[in-house]
Design a protein with these regions (language model features):
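Intrinsically disordered, low-complexity regions
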Residues: 6, 22, 57, 96-97
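Sec-dependent N-terminal signal peptides
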Residues: 3-13
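Acidic/histidine-enriched segments that form metal/cofactor-coordinating
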Residues: 53, 79-80, 87-173
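Hydrophobic side chains within alpha-helical segments
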Residues: 5, 72-75, 145, 152
Length: 173
């Protein structure tokens, strides 16, 4: 009975949020083909921005596994306009947070920050999409970071190794 009451509460609560227009999504496409979805939340002066690229580990060529995850890391290395660590330091300095993740079908980057910085964050995001600056040094550093992540997440976990083996059979590339 308590479970039914709890479910009814959440259904009522989220229906109210939807009816008040708190989570109404609007979507459109830019001239360059990029799809944009905006979900406005009027409860706080904060923005959550996510950029999803249709490039994940499932589309990597044979012999190039890990490239999507590697690029995810390298995208934080900066540009001429916003050098190494500027992006992350800026978001942290304004009280925001950011991260990224790679899946089989996509790589996603997200930030949460005060809405008054939206224009600046979007400029930085657009800049790193086309002006990423890589050096041999920062490529080598990230390579070591990824190998350590692999050791922690896969090599030291038998179930993760099994999962990886099964996926290599299901998806030969």
């Amino acid at each position: 009975m308590k479970l039914v009451g709890l479910i009814l509460f959440f259904l009522t609560f989220f229906s109210k949020l939807q009816s008040e227009g708190i989570y109404n999504a609007k979507s459109f496409q830019l001239k360059n083909g990029m799809k944009v979805v905006v979900v406005e939340n009027k409860r706080a002066p904060v923005v959550s921005q996510m950029i999803w690229y249709n490039f994940g580990s499932g589309v990597e060529e044979k012999g190039k596994s890990g490239l999507a995850h590697f690029m995810e890391h390298l995208m934080f290395k900066g540009t001429k306009k916003f050098p190494d660590n500027y992006y992350s330091n800026f978001i942290s300095r304004i009280g925001g947070s950011e991260n990224a993740f790679t899946s089989y079908d996509y790589t996603a980057y997200y930030q949460i920050f005060p809405k008054y910085e939206l224009e600046k964050i979007m400029q930085m995001e657009a800049d790193r999409m086309v002006n990423l600056t890589l050096t041999e040094e920062n490529v080598e550093i990230e390579k070591k970071v990824i190998l350590e992540e692999r050791f922690q997440r896969v090599e030291s976990d038998p179930s993760a190794k099994l999962d990886e083996s099964m996926r290599s059979i299901l998806f030969p590339n």
